[in-house]
């Protein structure tokens, strides 16, 4: 691809994303499906703006690579060890059972048994990019089904290596004996990467961070991700697996959040490029000539994988309310099929249009997943948002709650329990199905679903409520919900949870003045108790706590328009000096008041 053509392709991709994704969100079909439809529109079977699909698809796999690095950062080795049973138990069972069933079905058609085995393995894999994206959108990350889904995807990445090695054996083109020297070198190189990463990465990043130049840190992060991907590719292993390991090695480092921030914009853009490329690769010619075969294949593929995944989830002990989410989000074919089927085609395992038919089936199955998950959400909404049983006595006796609480995790539960104890009429919106089921058993008015959907807010009584308390885990969800409430329900008093100072600044900029930083108050209280244990009188410690709170809030408001680190640091130093002066001025006055203060500790 020439330089000018590459630039034109980049402009087209950006235009497709900017046009398709907001339209898809407006239609309620999700960003992933919007990317896929945009790819079909600009690809060789649509308007024909871009024809070199294979090269772009290979480049766009970097989106998956960046995504796996961020996932690795969220796990540490001890947590990964805890998942070993689900990775090598459920993950292995899913691949083997799905591959066996799908290979058997392919053998009933014109596929030779060797081609059927390769086809079954390729179709058994799921799309890491799509599944993880949808799990994040649906709030499945911290749920039992989300953890199990990640374990299955991780095993599928590990299965890439033996699957690719199996192709030449099935084609009869493998060497009579293995080159044990070459295999040994690859194993040593892989072990060397693990050891080197374990002991060298932190000192290297510490040295880079000492320069104080953010751009250099970002460049080093990109070098780490791309370098580990290329290194694993040279060993014949999965690039995504390499970056995942690099992320795990840095999961417990002090640079974890900075690394995540540096990578996140690249991950989002490249993931969008990946989905657009998948849409471009859809061969509409094969779809037109073999329409019935393709439709039946897609239905059978999705049905077989859902059946296998649902049964495994049941055997593993996943709650019944989460099994369909787990099965649905992994029901599609994956990006690995493109690599495996291309390798098999080069070994002449496929005949005629067999490879094209399989790839069309995989692509269309990926397009069904967002729609399938919407159907699952609707089914769950009907199941959990229906009327209460006759023997239940809900806190809300009518459809006019005083308060809507969004999220009922550790933070939201404290607020909800306080309101319930004071007989306030509340409605809770929660995305964790098991929590919804439990709370409805106790008679609480709970709705399952995404609170950023205006229709759900209306159903929950937002038009009649006085206040809404937002306790979402993700800051993006919080800000989106604030915007929706301000636009559609301007009468609501908005109270929100902020995870830290950055989120507090964003809330203040959005006009939300009633918020609470989740660790600030508890940290202040513990600090007050620490002052008392060090000999300070309880009255003086209480005043110190109040002064600190007021000054910190004033700083927070003053620094809203300022985001430069140097300004923040400079103002923080001034505030510390100001706080010390306040305490010194009040020392004598505090001593006079000590006699009138009763110790309460």
Swiss-Prot record:
PROSITE patterns for this protein: RCK_N
NCBIfam families documented for this protein: 2a37, PRK03659.1
Entry keyword set: Antiport, Cell inner membrane, Cell membrane, Ion transport, Membrane, Potassium, Potassium transport, Transmembrane, Transmembrane helix, Transport
Pfam families: Na_H_Exchanger, TrkA_N
Matching InterPro entries: Cation/H_exchanger_TM (IPR006153), K/H_exchanger (IPR004771), K_H_efflux_KefB (IPR020884), Na+/solute_symporter_sf (IPR038770), NAD(P)-bd_dom_sf (IPR036291), RCK_N (IPR003148)
Any one cellular-component term (Gene Ontology): plasma membrane
Membrane topology: Multi-pass membrane protein
GO molecular function: glutathione-regulated potassium exporter activity
SUPFAM superfamilies: NAD(P)-binding Rossmann-fold domains
Protein family according to the UniProt entry: Belongs to the monovalent cation:proton antiporter 2 (CPA2) transporter (TC 2.A.37) family. KefB subfamily.
Compartment(s) where it occurs, according to its Swiss-Prot or TrEMBL record: Cell inner membrane
The keyword Transmembrane helix is assigned to this record: yes
Gene3D superfamilies in alphabetical order: 1.20.1530.20, NAD(P)-binding Rossmann-like Domain
GO terms (BP aspect): proton transmembrane transport
Subunit structure: Interacts with the regulatory subunit KefG.
UniProt keyword Nucleotide-binding, yes or no: no
Task of the protein: Pore-forming subunit of a potassium efflux system that confers protection against electrophiles. Catalyzes K(+)/H(+) antiport.
Domain RCK N-terminal intervals: 400-519
Predominant location: membrane
Protein name per its UniProtKB record: Glutathione-regulated potassium-efflux system protein KefB
Transmembrane parts of this sequence: 4-24, 29-49, 55-75, 87-107, 115-135, 152-172, 177-197, 207-227, 230-250, 268-288, 291-311, 324-344, 356-376
